[in-house]
Amino acid sequence: MYNLKDMTLEEMEEFFVNLGESKFRAKQLYKWIYDKRVTDFDLMTDISKNLRAKLKEIAYISELKIIERRVSQIDDTVKYLFLLEDKNIIEGVAIKYKFGNTACVSTQVGCNMKCKFCASAIGGKVRDLKASEMVDQVMAIDSDYGKISNIVLMGSGEPFDNYDEVMKFIKIVNNPYGLKIGKRHITISTVGIVPKIYQFADEELQVNLSISLHAPNNELRNELMPINRAYPLEELMKACRYYIEKTNRRITFEYALIDGVNDKKEHAYQLVDLLKGMLCHVNLIPINYVKEIGFRKSNNEKVMMFKKIIENAGITCTVRRELGSDIEAACGQLRRKYLKEG
């Protein structure tokens, strides 16, 4: 059975041509699926009964089931657990900002990157998500939480480790017949898979790129993020500079501050040296406490010291507000708790 949500508009046009139908049927189906949110072919009244019958035999339109929904009493952040068709479980998050609602989307079940501070890494990667499963997260959050205007691929998983499905997902949500979310309202976050950064730069999309950096030198980054052993900082920075030159777009560097690990003055100065002259922004993140890992966030005094050093060097810097700390909104936390409790 074909899941129609796994098809870009061009793929769906080809699908209908192969059925002996006109390719304009694809736009009709896209409208039913993404505008009217209809999953029952019998309700698609501008499509002939014969074609509806044929579609029921060979295709379906997926939906995600919400199995848990936690609302933060602090900031209205909502954490979702979704049940996939194969009974795997993934997380999504809805975040309210002044400029609109953001959906934080997972790209894999679990993650293989083994970052030492991340709950998603505990247990490793189970499998990649299909484009439809990413689309369904956005649509489920949109239906439950309210209109989604921004997407961040910062949930569980490494987007560039599932590159082709992520690119397909972007095409579907960005399509004017799809979810109509502008590319500049979509952000991809990567730990730094260098060949994929070059490939992504060459796509010349207007999608935002965020790099999970978290350490200013190779020794510390090797310890915190094993990906650095494959692609050390020199290679990562070279790829980032290529991306900026190719796209003329700013990169955001994410830096999770961990008490006593990467939050010293020397680390801030090393970070400044690393990013000097780049079109970039630094986003400091107070890390979420994960019991199995044991890292704790830096205190406010250290965060402000770190921020001041970066800003004094002429690099823009913000501190991300803590989101959903009362509902285990960090990557992988709620899923792991749910699986442990059975």
From Swiss-Prot:
The gene is rlmN. Reaction proceeds by a ping-pong mechanism involving intermediate methylation of a conserved cysteine residue. GO terms for biological process: rRNA base methylation; tRNA methylation. Binds 1 [4Fe-4S] cluster. The cluster is coordinated with 3 cysteines and an exchangeable S-adenosyl-L-methionine. Keywords: 4Fe-4S, Cytoplasm, Disulfide bond, Iron, Iron-sulfur, Metal-binding, Methyltransferase, rRNA processing, S-adenosyl-L-methionine, Transferase, tRNA processing. This is Probable dual-specificity RNA methyltransferase RlmN. It is found in: Cytoplasm. It comes from Caldanaerobacter subterraneus subsp. tengcongensis (strain DSM 15242 / JCM 11007 / NBRC 100824 / MB4). Its cofactor is [4Fe-4S] cluster. It catalyses: adenosine(2503) in 23S rRNA + 2 reduced [2Fe-2S]-[ferredoxin] + 2 S-adenosyl-L-methionine = 2-methyladenosine(2503) in 23S rRNA + 5'-deoxyadenosine + L-methionine + 2 oxidized [2Fe-2S]-[ferredoxin] + S-adenosyl-L-homocysteine; adenosine(37) in tRNA + 2 reduced [2Fe-2S]-[ferredoxin] + 2 S-adenosyl-L-methionine = 2-methyladenosine(37) in tRNA + 5'-deoxyadenosine + L-methionine + 2 oxidized [2Fe-2S]-[ferredoxin] + S-adenosyl-L-homocysteine. Belongs to the radical SAM superfamily. RlmN family. InterPro entries: Aldolase_TIM, Methyltransferase_A, RlmN_N, RNA_MTrfase_RlmN, rRNA_lsu_MTrfase_RlmN/Cfr, rSAM. GO terms for molecular function: 4 iron, 4 sulfur cluster binding; metal ion binding; rRNA (adenine(2503)-C2-)-methyltransferase activity; rRNA binding; tRNA (adenine(37)-C2)-methyltransferase activity; tRNA binding. Disulfide bonds join C104-C331.
